[in-house]
């Protein structure tokens, strides 16, 4: 294949590019020969520059609950017509649009009114698209840090209402009129956040007048966003562990008191919960404006564990009581031994023996029998001469002392068994009560908000 056709094609393309560049160069030179970027682009100074504003939300970067700052990545689309930048495409080789630096032309000085921490105005001056009709489109990117009142009452099942208020800084409505491109911001290129989802968004125009100049309107466009937090992270890492700690606390009452491990388990649960709370405390918004739901639940869990320790001490104290230190009141015996076990069907729990040693140790007569079992002499009364013998009398006194000692020991053992039985009944009752309180407390903290969110859809 001959190389000259390729050379010819390359030469024609190069000539076209040079010619096109020449047309654009002449056009730019002509447009900006006497152009001033500080003068409003109108034919008559009484005319109003109409600026159409559109907000494209790209990313929700951060929501700072403590400082109440929402950081977003946006593109601020602005369109207007510049009377001084029109041309006839036929005079410039058919060039209908060009890209020029935004610093060279007049621009509406739009700023974020509710700026919290950052630049009020746009700092990235990208190029604008200029058409032969004078229509200008400028879409600069910006990182906005806007103030938003963060209400953490329902955290982590919360919704936040935030807004971005845009307007010109120096121009009032009589010289520059701003209008929203749409009643909603553009979310077509929005990158989903792992923590927030935008449920609702809208935009509207405001016109405000002040007492100093009632005939002069000041315009702004406010974009409003309703953001709902995705709570899965907090459910898995905070709520479920706290719930498990609560259930583990209830199991303290399932552990037998005789094992001696009740207090060990209770203190271990408390220490584990304390370390856990120290680890996750940074996940909770540190604000004093309100106590979030998750903070209430963590407080409930801590009180729940401490209450179990206090009650465990009482149960252990009850278990180790004895007649020498405590006398069981009749109401305790009636409630915890006679009534509650029957009501709660504690049939498997062996009740303490309450038989009293009220038999007479001695009878009026003493029957003396032979060791071999053969009948002995007739019974002798207390007035028998043999009974009055000193050695026999001493033996009888010894037998009487032994019997009374055995009776006292038996009564002491029965009383101690009753206290242990009362402690066992208390354990069974508290096991059910604490498990029930754990479930009811969890539902009381979160159920109301979850039902409300479900009704909202």
Swiss-Prot record:
Pfam families, per database record: Neur_chan_LBD, Neur_chan_memb
InterPro entries xrefs: Neur_chan_lig-bd, Neur_chan_lig-bd_sf, Neur_channel, Neuro-gated_channel_TM_sf, Neuro_actylchol_rec, Neurotrans-gated_channel_TM, Neurotransmitter_ion_chnl_CS, Nicotinic_acetylcholine_rcpt
Annotated TM spans: 233-253, 265-285, 297-317, 428-448
Record keywords: Cell membrane, Congenital myasthenic syndrome, Disease variant, Disulfide bond, Glycoprotein, Ion channel, Ion transport, Ligand-gated ion channel, Membrane, Postsynaptic cell membrane, Receptor, Signal, Synapse, Transmembrane, Transmembrane helix, Transport
Example of a GO cellular component annotation carried by this entry: acetylcholine-gated channel complex
Consequence of changing residue 438 to W: In CMS1A; increases the rate of channel opening and slows the rate of channel closing but has no effect on agonist binding
Disulfide bond residue pairs: 148-162, 212-213
Record-level Gene Ontology MF annotations: acetylcholine binding; acetylcholine receptor activity; acetylcholine-gated monoatomic cation-selective channel activity; transmitter-gated monoatomic ion channel activity involved in regulation of postsynaptic membrane potential
Signal sequence extent: 1-20
Tissues showing expression: Isoform 1 is only expressed in skeletal muscle. Isoform 2 is constitutively expressed in skeletal muscle, brain, heart, kidney, liver, lung and thymus.
Effect of residue 261 to Q: Changed acetylcholine-gated cation-selective channel activity
Glycosylation sites: 161
Gene3D superfamilies: Neurotransmitter-gated ion-channel ligand-binding domain, Neurotransmitter-gated ion-channel transmembrane domain
Side of membrane Cytoplasmic, spans: 254-264, 318-427
Presence of keyword Phosphoprotein: no
Lineage: superkingdom: Eukaryota
Residue spans, topological domain Extracellular: 21-232, 286-296, 449-457
Substitution effect: residue 253 to V: In CMS1B; markedly reduced protein expression
Enzymatic reactions: K(+)(in) = K(+)(out); Na(+)(in) = Na(+)(out)
Disease / disorder: Multiple pterygium syndrome, lethal type: Multiple pterygia are found infrequently in children with arthrogryposis and in fetuses with fetal akinesia syndrome. In lethal multiple pterygium syndrome there is intrauterine growth retardation, multiple pterygia, and flexion contractures causing severe arthrogryposis and fetal akinesia. Subcutaneous edema can be severe, causing fetal hydrops with cystic hygroma and lung hypoplasia. Oligohydramnios and facial anomalies are frequent.
Stated family: Belongs to the ligand-gated ion channel (TC 1.A.9) family. Acetylcholine receptor (TC 1.A.9.1) subfamily. Alpha-1/CHRNA1 sub-subfamily.
Entry protein name: Acetylcholine receptor subunit alpha
Species whose genome carries this gene: Homo sapiens (Human)
Taxon lineage: Eukaryota, Metazoa, Chordata, Craniata, Vertebrata
């Amino acid at each position: 294949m001959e190389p000259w056709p390729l050379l010819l094609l390359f030469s024609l393309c190069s000539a076209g590019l040079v010619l096109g560049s020449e047309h654009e160069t002449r056009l730019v030179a002509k447009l900006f020969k006497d152009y001033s970027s500080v003068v409003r682009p109108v034919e008559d100074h009484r005319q109003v520059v109409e600026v159409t504003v559109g907000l494209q939300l790209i990313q929700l970067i951060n929501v700072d609950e403590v400082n109440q700052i929402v950081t977003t990545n946006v593109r601020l689309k602005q369109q207007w017509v510049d009377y001084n930048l029109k041309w006839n495409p036929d005079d410039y080789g058919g060039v209908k649009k060009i890209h020029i630096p935004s610093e060279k032309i007049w621009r509406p000085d739009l700023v974020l009114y509710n700026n919290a921490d950052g630049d009020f105005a746009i700092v990235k001056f990208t190029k604008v698209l200029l058409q032969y009709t004078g229509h200008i489109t400028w879409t600069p990117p910006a990182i906005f840090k806007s103030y938003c009142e963060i209400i953490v009452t329902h955290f982590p099942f919360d919704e936040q209402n935030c807004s971005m208020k845009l307007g010109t800084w120096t121009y009032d409505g009589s010289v520059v009129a701003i209008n929203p491109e749409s009643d909603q911001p553009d979310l077509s290129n929005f990158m989903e956040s792992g923590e927030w989802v935008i449920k609702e968004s809208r935009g509207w125009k405001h016109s405000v007048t002040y007492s100093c100049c009632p005939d002069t309107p000041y315009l702004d466009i406010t974009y409003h966003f309703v953001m709902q937090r995705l709570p899965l992270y907090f459910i898995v890492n905070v709520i479920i562990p706290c719930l498990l700690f609560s259930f583990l606390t209830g199991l303290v009452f399932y552990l037998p008191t005789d094992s001696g491990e009740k207090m060990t388990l209770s203190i271990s649960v408390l220490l584990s919960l304390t370390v856990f709370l120290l680890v996750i405390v940074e996940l909770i918004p540190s604000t004093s404006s309100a106590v979030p739901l998750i903070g209430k639940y963590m407080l409930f869990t801590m009180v729940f564990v401490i209450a179990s320790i206090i009650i465990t001490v009482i149960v252990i104290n009850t278990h180790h009581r004895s007649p020498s230190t405590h006398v069981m009141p009749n109401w305790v015996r009636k409630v915890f031994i006679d009534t509650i076990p029957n009501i709660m069907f504690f049939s498997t729990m062996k009740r303490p023996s309450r038989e009293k040693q009220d038999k007479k140790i001695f009878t009026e007569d003493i029957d003396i029998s032979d060791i071999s079992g053969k009948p002995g002499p007739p019974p002798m009364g207390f007035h028998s001469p043999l009974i009055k013998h000193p050695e026999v009398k001493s033996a009888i006194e010894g037998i009487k002392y032994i019997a009374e000692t055995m009776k006292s020991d038996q009564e002491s053992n029965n009383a101690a068994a009753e206290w242990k039985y009362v402690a066992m009944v208390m354990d069974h009752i508290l096991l059910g009560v604490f498990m029930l309180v754990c479930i009811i407390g969890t539902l009381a903290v979160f159920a109301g908000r979850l039902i409300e969110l479900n009704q909202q859809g």
